Design a protein with these regions (language model features):
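Helix-to-loop junctions at the C-terminal end of transmembrane segments
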Residues: 56-69, 270-281
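C-terminal ends and interior cores of transmembrane alpha-helices
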Residues: 78-93, 292-304
Length: 329
């Protein structure tokens, strides 16, 4: 069996690569200015990528599990990198349609496959701490904008939009390939009551299969709370940079730095909240998310204070990241 901490490092490597999608807001204004696209046209690219992330993760999850983490990781790399190179081409000819196709659809499929691959693998190495393992696996996805935000802002300023995507594509090709080649599922063990988590025991004792679970009211409830939590965070992530520039008069460089800080809280929220949920409970943790977000969004709409505005954004993002980590656990 491979070292589980190196497996965790490989998982983080995959997620840091695809998680750069969270820094999209840094590119919003440059794309609008250089390409002549509207704000809604530009942000729809991000929305489409996130939509495809969810769809591909949902419909290709069993396929990724079947072919194994190494092959599914490499497949995610091919889609994501192809999406980035295609985006560079789309921007070079000022094509909004191709931008949607390459970044939104093709890149989005890579996001979905790349998202579930390390999560399902790493949880198997930490059978008694599923919340911690999930948070550890997707921590890189949240932290990615810490690196990608300032990096994209620098690349766009010095080499232009098109070359920015080419450089990112080459970088992620290397990182994702190396990470995928190390990923390997652990050797299966015969489950015992001492090494089974409660959810696994329930499946064995009650015979609850995926198709059966989807027919229950609990599944519908989980889907809706997950949807609401994602919507709260995505709305901020897609507009974080231009929103802070307009609302509290941040410079583009400062806004890019804030996007990086958002990455810290996004990633930190994933590992912190998921670990807390191992002891506090998943349902109770989600209730706390909603209480925090309701209060934070209300105050956010009323405040004109720059510090308060930024603190509230970061608080909401921790809940957003934590929701992603708690749900798979």
């Amino acid at each position: 069996m491979r070292n589980r901490w190196l497996i965790a490092l490989a998982a983080i490597g995959l997620h840091i690569s695809i998680g750069s999608v969270y820094a999209w807001s840094v590119l919003t204004r440059p794309i609008m200015v250089d390409m002549g696209f509207t704000l809604s046209q530009t942000t729809w690219t991000f929305s489409l990528a996130i939509l495809m992330l969810g769809l591909s993760a949902g419909f290709l999850g069993s396929f990724a599990e079947k072919i194994g983490p190494k092959k599914s990781g490499l497949l995610a790399m091919l889609f994501w990198v192809a999406g980035l190179f295609g985006t560079a081409y789309a921007l070079s000819i000022h094509s909004l349609t191709l931008l949607y196709l390459f970044y939104g659809i093709i890149g989005g499929i890579g996001l979905g496959i790349g998202y579930i691959t390390p999560v399902s693998t790493l949880v198997k190495y930490f059978p008694n701490r599923p919340g911690f393992a999930t948070g550890l696996a997707i921590m890189g996805f949240g932290f990615a904008s810490l690196i990608a935000g300032p990096l994209m802002q620098y690349l766009v300023a010095h080499v232009g939009l098109v070359n920015n995507f080419i450089i990112l594509g080459i970088t992620y090709l290397i990182v994702m390939s190396a990470s995928s080649l190390y990923l390997k599922a652990p050797t299966p063990k015969v489950p015992t009551r001492s090494n089974q988590d409660k959810s696994t025991m329930y499946v064995h004792n009650h015979g609850m299969l995926a198709n059966d679970a989807m027919k229950t009211w609990q599944f519908s409830a989980l889907w809706w709370v997950f949807f609401v939590n994602i919507t709260c965070g995505i709305g901020l992530l897609s507009l974080a940079s231009p929103m802070t520039q307009e609302t509290i008069s941040m410079t583009p460089a400062a806004a890019a730095s804030l996007v990086g800080i958002i990455g810290i809280f996004n990633g930190g929220g994933r590992i912190a909240w998921s670990t807390i949920s191992d002891y506090f409970g998943r349902a109770q943790t989600y209730i706390l998310f909603f209480i925090i977000q309701i209060i934070a969004f209300y105050v956010l709409a009323e405040t004109n204070n720059a510090l308060t505005f930024q603190v509230l954004i970061l608080l909401i993002i921790t809940c957003y990241g934590g929701g992603f980590a708690c749900m798979p656990a």
